UniProtKB/Swiss-Prot annotation:
<dbReference type="InterPro" id="IPR008271">
    <property type="entry name" value="Ser/Thr_kinase_AS"/>
</dbReference>
<keyword id="KW-0539">Nucleus</keyword>
<keyword id="KW-0547">Nucleotide-binding</keyword>
<feature type="modified residue" description="Phosphotyrosine">
    <location>
        <position position="173"/>
    </location>
</feature>
<keyword id="KW-0418">Kinase</keyword>
<dbReference type="Pfam" id="PF00069">
    <property type="entry name" value="Pkinase"/>
</dbReference>
<dbReference type="InterPro" id="IPR003527">
    <property type="entry name" value="MAP_kinase_CS"/>
</dbReference>
<keyword id="KW-0808">Transferase</keyword>
<feature type="binding site">
    <location>
        <position position="49"/>
    </location>
    <ligand>
        <name>ATP</name>
    </ligand>
</feature>
<feature type="modified residue" description="Phosphothreonine">
    <location>
        <position position="171"/>
    </location>
</feature>
<keyword id="KW-0067">ATP-binding</keyword>
<comment type="similarity">
    <text>Belongs to the protein kinase superfamily. Ser/Thr protein kinase family. MAP kinase subfamily. HOG1 sub-subfamily.</text>
</comment>
<dbReference type="GO" id="GO:0004707">
    <property type="term" value="F:MAP kinase activity"/>
</dbReference>
<keyword id="KW-0723">Serine/threonine-protein kinase</keyword>
<protein>
    <recommendedName>
        <fullName>Mitogen-activated protein kinase HOG1</fullName>
        <ecNumber>2.7.11.24</ecNumber>
    </recommendedName>
</protein>
<feature type="active site" description="Proton acceptor">
    <location>
        <position position="141"/>
    </location>
</feature>
<dbReference type="GO" id="GO:0005634">
    <property type="term" value="C:nucleus"/>
</dbReference>
Length: 358
């Protein structure tokens, strides 16, 4: 059995295996507290995320199970990877991942980014999205704080807790407003991988300009700001709006002409403007894909078609429509954790597949 040690972080009990030392708080989210720690086994710094009360409700248990499954499945240089997972004696779940020094939000609020950094960061975002989308996964909450960066400018997309299957009937508001695609605001349904491209376009604009492109105060204001720059959506897009109230609201707005992005981004390259215009398109089906963006002239300095992999297999979403009690989710989670350790043990050369001592 692994030996566990306890520490108090922000009034929260962290109960982790003795493999990890020197806990330091990094950040607090709605669903978990993240600390940095030293992995005694690898001598590397890692991030340890405690999932708060994962078994308190079926919704939270399912969300935790989904995040675990995604972290296990997604293996790519530009996506955060799982290095350990365990359940403490108090039945809290801890995800251990790579630790990167900062995130794009912190970088953007500290100083302007030079062109080569913007290109390299955007390239890595699109390279990661190409892989994620090929696995049948939509991130849904892409924003600067979910994009981690280290001192070598290596970039990794994180926080897949909200990610969902590519489903033509997706529902609800999920992503942070500034980066939210219009089809999420307008229809509450029928959205797909293209929402991540819109979010990436907003992040691209923010890297170029140093401030959010569409800083809406609420949903109505958000949509209004978007139309001030991009004009009124075309009729064929407006006619896809499912909600009658939303449809009435959009039709009541004054008609606006699209403004040239060049007017707003006067110092940007023509190729940067062209790529942004292809990302920030009202009609999702006319938006550039991640794979197409990688081939765009703006990303040419980094583009390597032989080193932009896709997923070997699609993610299995068969659990996602299940309405199960907490105890069932708990059993499924235990099974996934055992499977993870058995696979890792096998990869380490432990023939019997037993879980290595923590």
């Amino acid at each position: 059995m692994a030996e566990f040690v306890r520490a108090q972080i922000f009034g929260t009990t962290f109960e982790i295996t003795s493999r990890y030392s020197d806990l330091q708080p990094v950040g607090m989210g709605a669903f978990g507290l993240v600390c940095s720690a030293r992995d005694q086994l690898t001598n590397q710094n890692v991030a340890v995320k405690k999932i708060m009360k994962p078994f308190s409700t079926p919704v939270l248990a399912k969300r935790t199970y989904r995040e675990l499954k995604l972290l296990k499945h997604l293996r790519h240089e530009n996506v955060i990877s799982l290095s350990d997972i365990f359940i403490s004696p108090l039945e809290d779940i801890y995800f251990v991942t790579e630790l990167l020094g900062t995130d794009l939000h912190r970088l953007l609020t500290s100083r302007p980014l030079e062109k080569q950094f913007i290109q390299y960061f955007l390239y890595q975002i699109m390279r990661g999205l190409k892989y994620v989308h090929s696995a049948g996964v939509v991130h849904r909450d892409l924003k600067p704080s979910n994009i981690l960066v280290n001192e070598n400018c290596d970039l990794k997309i994180c926080d897949f807790g909200l990610a969902r299957i590519q489903d033509p009937q997706m529902t609800g508001y999920v992503s942070t407003r500034y980066y939210r695609a219009p089809e999420i605001m307008l229809t509450w349904q029928k959205y797909d991988v293209e929402v991540d491209i819109w979010s990436a376009g907003c992040i691209f604009a923010e890297m170029l300009d140093g401030k959010p492109l569409f800083p809406g105060k609420d949903h109505v204001n958000q949509f209004s700001i978007i139309t001030e720059l991009l004009g009124t959506p075309p009729d064929d897009v407006i006619n896809t709006i499912a909600s009658e109230n939303t449809l009435r609201f959009v039709k009541s707005l004054p008609k606006r002409e699209r403004q040239p992005l060049r007017n707003k981004f006067r110092n940007a390259d023509d190729s940067a403007i062209d790529l942004m215009e292809r990302m920030l398109v009202f009609d999702p089906k006319k938006r550039i894909t991640a794979a197409e963006a990688l081939s765009h002239d703006y990303l040419a300095p980094y583009h390597d078609p032989t080193d932009e992999p896709v997923a070997e297999e699609k993610f299995d979403w068969s659990f996602n429509d299940a309405d199960l009690p907490v105890d069932t989710w708990k059993i499924m989670m235990y099974s996934e954790i055992l499977d993870y350790h058995n696979v890792e043990a096998g990869a380490s050369g432990l023939e019997d597949g037993s879980v290595p001592a923590q």
